[in-house]
A protein has these predicted regions:
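Iron-sulfur-associated redox domains of electron-transfer enzymes in respiratory
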Residues: 1-71
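Structural signal for hydrophobic packing residues in well-ordered secondary-structure cores
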Residues: 26-36, 88-91, 95, 154-157, ...
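Ferredoxin-type iron-sulfur electron-transfer modules in oxidoreductases and energy-metabolism complexes
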Residues: 44, 52-78, 93-192
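Short Cys/His-rich zinc-binding micro-motifs
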Residues: 81
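Extended amphipathic alpha-helical segments enriched in small hydrophobics
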Residues: 84-88, 133
Length: 192
């Protein structure tokens, strides 16, 4: 209602919000409502085609690092996200922490990926707030492979100089034990 009265309207949104036609808009509107809140259709959607008579309508398409993400083939699917929140609703870490496990302003699995795409040196610690259970990838309505992307970001930590030495040593030790079944069984037997 607040946009129907003024003679000047300014809309700002990310480039991933652009849909090719009204048929696609219908699909995304239903998909967003079902995935976010379980409703058959959303209760509030605004559609703007042109300015009102004698008015102006300006559209600002915000890039905010999105085009840089296009150059990362392993993470390009992040741009498919419709921000429904289904990944957060199913994430065991998010459900238990309420989002406080994350330092990026968007929590959950999608926030981990967006934070790493935006500033990996600042948000790399969010990668440990994921159990890689893959529930987020299974529930995503637009098939963003969130867990796979988080796994790939973890592999990139060495290149960023942010890999956790303690975790690397522990993983190396586990790899060593797992490759030697007799030694692994002996370790299990000796454990308290």
């Amino acid at each position: 209602m607040g946009t129907s009265y003024p003679k000047l309207n300014i809309a700002a949104f990310g480039m991933e919000k652009i849909v090719p036609d009204l048929d696609a808009l219908g699909v995304f509107t239903r998909l967003l409502a079902r995935s976010a809140t379980g409703q058959p259709v959303t209760t509030y959607t605004s559609h703007y085609r042109r300015p009102r008579e004698g008015g102006e309508y300006h559209i600002i398409i915000v890039d905010n690092g999105r085009s840089a993400l296009l150059s990362k083939p392993d993470h390009i699917k992040t741009l498919n996200c419709i921000r429904c929140g289904a990944c957060m609703n199913t994430c065991p870490v998010y459900r238990r922490s309420g989002g406080y496990s994350y330092t990026y302003f968007i929590p959950g699995p999608i926030g981990i990926n967006l934070g790493m795409a935006h500033a990996p040196e600042k948000y790399y610690d969010n990668l440990s707030a994921c159990s890689l259970c893959m529930s987020c990838s299974d529930v995503c309505p637009v098939k963003v492979d969130l867990a796979e992307q988080i796994y790939k970001w973890r592999q990139d930590l060495d290149g960023l100089g942010k890999a956790n030495t303690g975790k690397k040593i522990m993983s190396g030790g586990m790899k060593f034990l797992m490759e030697r079944p007799a030694l692994f069984n002996a370790a299990l037997w000796a454990a308290p």
